[in-house]
Design a protein with these regions (language model features):
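Solvent-exposed interaction patches of small proteins and small membrane subunits
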Residues: 1-150
Length: 150
């Protein structure tokens, strides 16, 4: 691995850490709010920030980090599904099916506008966040063989 690739990986892992930290903050805040029929405007704002942070972290992990790991491992590029399946084989994630669901929810976050559907998204994001965070930790551990950092 070139020094340039190692520096790029370290930079992307820092971005991943920062995004994880802010997602954890929002996860804790929104877990305390919980799922309910009606939200106060401040609660909606918290959940909207949370879902945006969830989508951002999933993009960083799947689109940037998994792609970079594939490049470092000399794997061929492919579809997002291919990338997720390879991540499961490398044990970066526990389940490719869960990460496909994370990707679907990420797309729903970007394109859903109906209030009743948004509440459903809130529940899904709350249940999927621990899996996303686990994927981050597994990936960082895997990447330590390239960076000598955990």
């Amino acid at each position: 691995m070139t020094e340039q690739m190692q520096l790029l990986l370290l930079k992307e892992l820092k971005v991943l850490d920062d995004a994880r930290d802010i997602l954890v903050y929002s996860f804790n805040k929104c877990s305390a709010i919980g799922i309910k029929e009606n939200y106060e405007p401040e609660e909606l704002e918290s959940f909207e920030s949370y879902t945006g942070r969830f989508a951002r972290l999933s993009d960083i992990l799947i689109q940037k980090i998994f792609r970079l790991v594939d490049e470092l491992d000399l794997d061929t590029q492919g579809t997002i599904r291919d990338r997720i399946n390879r991540a499961e084989k490398k044990e970066l994630i526990a389940s490719s099916d869960i990460f496909v669901e994370i990707r679907i929810v990420r797309n729903d976050i970007a394109h859903e506008y109906l209030p009743e559907a948004i509440r459903d998204i809130f529940g899904k994001v709350l249940s999927l966040t621990p899996h996303l965070l686990d994927g981050v930790e597994r990936t960082k551990k895997y990447c330590s063989k390239y960076t000598n950092v955990v």
